[in-house]
Amino acid sequence: MQFSVGVEYAFHSLFYMVDLPPQKTIGIKEIAKLNGIAETYLSKVFSKLRKAGIVRSVPGVKGGYELAKDTEDISFWDIIVAIEGPSFFFRCAEIRKKNIFVDSPNVFTSKCPCLIKVVIQDAEESMRNGLRAKSLSWLHDTVCKDFPDEKKQAIAAWSRGIKT
């Protein structure tokens, strides 16, 4: 299992949006420049974040993007699903029913689920629950507590200086 680079772009971009003053938006160009990434790909990432209700686009001359929810209400899982979609990592094709040693494929019913499927789905659910338990707010607070004061001041100044 591997997430696309879009997930990383989303996390790093949203991280800095936490510091934006209220009613302040930020454009794709500024976010791309901040993170040293391509505007075109980041635009696609933000389109997905908007469709998921994580960010909101504000039209007009002073338009751009802003967070659409409180940072406590944006989980890691929300961000991943917005970018990657809600698919499961493992899809059981029930090949055990085709095994040459199986006399009757009908013995494999819901009473006898594939143990491989059960174990992997349990692991997936544990991972999803772990990702649901961490929010954008948690990420921001955890990372920023170790930032030196001059770095925090630089981020705040950058946030205030964004032209919208």
Feature roles, as predicted:
Residues 46-47:
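Short, hydrophobic-biased segments on the C-terminal half of alpha helices
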Residues 1-14:
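Short alpha-helical segments that sit at the start of domains
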Residues 33, 50-51:
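Alpha-helical residues within the helix-turn-helix
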Residues 28-36:
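A short alpha-helical element within helix-turn-helix/winged-helix DNA-binding domains
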Residues 13-22:
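Short amphipathic alpha-helical interface segments
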Residues 54-62, 66-68:
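Beta-hairpin "wing" of winged helix-turn-helix
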